[in-house]
Amino acid sequence: MFEPLRKFPDFSDEQAAAWEAIAARMASHGVELEAGATTPRTEHSGPGEVIAVTGKAGSGKTVLLARLATRLAEIGLAAVTGDYEPRRRTRRSFAILAPTNKAAGVLRGHGVPATTIHRIVYTPVYDPEYQKVADWLEGERKTRPQVEGMTEAALDRAEAFYKQHGSVPGALAAAGVRGADFITGWTRRDQPLDIALVDEASMIDEARLDDLREIFGLIVLFGDPAQLAPINSQGEMVFETLPEPRRHHLARIHRQAAGNPILDLAHALGDPGLDFAAFEEMVRAAARDDDRVRIASRADAELMCTSPILVWRNKTRTRLIKAFRQAHHIADDRLVRGEPLICDGLELP
């Protein structure tokens, strides 16, 4: 029996109301957040149900999402991630999703096992030989597998890595198996899942939402109505088309209460009556009042070591990167400590 839910004293009234509304909808799908109980899945007929939590940056959407994810795991639901899925799934399931890998990475930074929508809509096809190793690591296979080309030492490395990190692709990489050998292709998912918590929902169009509704019985969208709508959405975000009872808005800005000039400026950009000159004056005023806002007439190579510089054109980006490397006497073909590296995530743990 799982522990009953302890209320969160740090929730605002809006967050608590949104939690209660989400908990009620999850209960109708057989997942009891309060009691910590689940009932067996029943096949849902028709598209999945959709509800939404909206609010600007700093309103507490991510905190609410993270608490929901933690609670779902506590009561025994299996988190479906972009890492690996066993072929036989008996537990109720949930997934934390984002439209892009960058957005999913932000959630992972909060300790949330997030992955991309694409990674859930499409599932990998595994090589049958390496599937034996995956099943063994996951406990689905009792006997140690024998796979051509894999030594006992390689299996030992895979087992040790999996026990420490819980990642099947990482374990296979530790054994010397490349992702391109382990995953031989991709196919559209035909196995239903239970609950999706979707962050950055302002970036999702109707077609992508329809994909999710074919897979999940319940979809909870988290989105910022102050963001720009997707290009092909005719100016409307998917959560804006939901009836009022299915939308729960968080109006209070928690981070603003701590005094955040960057957040103040970001929210000001949502004012349709604000022109460029007025916004520029707001930046100057913020710089006068707060050391966290500085106005510089040029790009500082020292600051670039720790602070990103945002530019409008790719040509400007390339020019600044070249100037930065020259200022630090870095050759064009040399990687240095701390420099970002973009790679195929399947090849590395």
Task: Describe every region a protein language model picked out.
Residues F2, A17-A21, P40, T54-S59, ...:
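Conserved P-loop NTPase motor core of helicases/translocases
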Residues F8-P40:
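N-terminal pre-P-loop "Q-motif" helix
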Residues A37, R41-I51:
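Pre-Walker A (Motif I) flank of P-loop NTPase domains
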Residues H44-P47, A79, D210, E214, ...:
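Conserved helicase motor core of P-loop NTPases
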Residues L64, L68:
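Hydrophobic positions on the alpha1 helix immediately C-terminal to the Walker A/P-loop
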Residues P192-I195, F216-L221:
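Loop/turn-to-beta-strand initiation segments
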